[in-house]
């Protein structure tokens, strides 16, 4: 039987009625739905699997019910599987989760009839190295960020590109983002907007203490190294704004384009700039 995984956002009242309806539709169309532990707080009408274990169920599709944050979490869970994701917007902005709730079943019908398009989004591979040893590694859809905690003191950073020095500087932090992440935190820090199909990465210093240091766009196959030369206490590496690890002086963050991509299900021809105009009011006066 064809299997579909369902991932939900916590504390969304509308899911109490939506999830049973969705599961009934999936059962009625011959699918075997499995739900994550958060979706299980709204219904028990499907088999419950911890979110981290859902890839082991080998679903053909993942349905994400929530906002962009829920999609980012799902993308990391399924990063190495290549399973397409249908993301339904139950959040506020929904820049990535662009499918409105009213179009959910139209998209599912399209999926069942093999009429959907698959849009691939590049991911970022990040490794944290300490004293020459790898501490952890992540795949990110939006970005990885080095940022300070409560103490209002800047950090000292050094960026190398393919082994060559780019700049050494003081700043509140640094954002390294994918083209998808160019419309997230990097944009708020005056970074450029990149179309999702551009083969590039963005390095955006946060409040650098240099008038001449500006965001940098580098080739997609670049090997970026961010060295933490000096930082205040409670400085963290954050992945997609959701996973964090405390940093130490001398830590190195190595970033490059991931070998994995996120596959987003689309029905129709809504373009990136259509979404920019609709969601971010791009070009309006």
Curated annotation (Swiss-Prot):
SUPFAM superfamilies associated with the record: NAD kinase/diacylglycerol kinase-like (SSF111331)
Query: Which residues act catalytically here?
Result: 68
Q: Which GO terms describe its biological process?
A: NAD metabolic process; NADP biosynthetic process
Record has NADP as a keyword: yes
List each coiled-coil range: none
Q: What is one cellular component GO term in this UniProt entry?
A: cytoplasm
Give the UniProt subcellular location, in the record's own words: Cytoplasm
Q: Where along the chain is NAD(+) bound?
A: 68-69, 142-143, 153, 170, 172, 242
Q: Which cofactor does it need?
A: a divalent metal cation
Entry-linked Pfam families: NAD_kinase, NAD_kinase_C
Q: Which family does it belong to?
A: Belongs to the NAD kinase family.
Q: What does this protein do?
A: Involved in the regulation of the intracellular balance of NAD and NADP, and is a key enzyme in the biosynthesis of NADP. Catalyzes specifically the phosphorylation on 2'-hydroxyl of the adenosine moiety of NAD to yield NADP.
Q: What is this protein called?
A: NAD kinase
Species name:
Acidobacterium capsulatum (strain ATCC 51196 / DSM 11244 / BCRC 80197 / JCM 7670 / NBRC 15755 / NCIMB 13165 / 161)
Task: Read off the lineage from the record.
Answer: Bacteria, Pseudomonadati, Acidobacteriota, Terriglobia, Terriglobales
The gene is: nadK
């Amino acid at each position: 039987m064809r299997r579909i995984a369902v991932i939900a956002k916590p504390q969304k009242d509308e899911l109490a009625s939506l999830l049973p309806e969705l599961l009934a539709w999936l059962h009625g169309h011959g699918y075997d739905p499995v739900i994550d532990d958060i979706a299980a707080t709204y219904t028990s009408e499907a088999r419950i699997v911890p979110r981290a274990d859902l890839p082991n169920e080998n679903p053909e599709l993942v349905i994400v019910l929530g906002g962009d944050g829920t999609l980012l979490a799902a993308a990391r869970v399924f990063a190495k599987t290549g399973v397409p994701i249908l993301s339904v917007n139950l959040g506020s902005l929904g820049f990535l989760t662009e499918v409105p709730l009213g179009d959910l079943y139209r998209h599912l019908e399209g999926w069942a009839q093999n009429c959907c398009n698959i849009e691939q989004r590049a991911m970022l591979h990040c490794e944290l190295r300490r004293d020459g040893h790898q501490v952890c590694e992540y795949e990110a859809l939006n970005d990885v960020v080095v940022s300070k905690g409560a103490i209002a003191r800047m950090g000292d950073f050094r960026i190398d590109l393919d082994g060559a020095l780019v700049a050494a500087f003081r700043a509140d932090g640094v954002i390294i983002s994918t083209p998808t992440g160019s419309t997230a935190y990097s944009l708020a820090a005056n970074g450029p907007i990149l179309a999702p199909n551009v083969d590039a990465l963005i390095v955006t210093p946060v409040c650098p203490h240099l008038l001449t240091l500006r965001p940098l766009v580098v080739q997609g196959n670049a090997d970026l190294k961010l060295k933490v030369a000096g930082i205040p206490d409670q400085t963290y590496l954050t992945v997609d704004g959701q996973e964090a690890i405390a940093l130490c002086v001398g830590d190195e963050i190595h970033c490059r384009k991931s070998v994995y991509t996120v596959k987003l299900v689309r029905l129709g021809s809504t373009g990136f700039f259509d979404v920019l105009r609709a969601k971010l009011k791009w070009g309006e006066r």
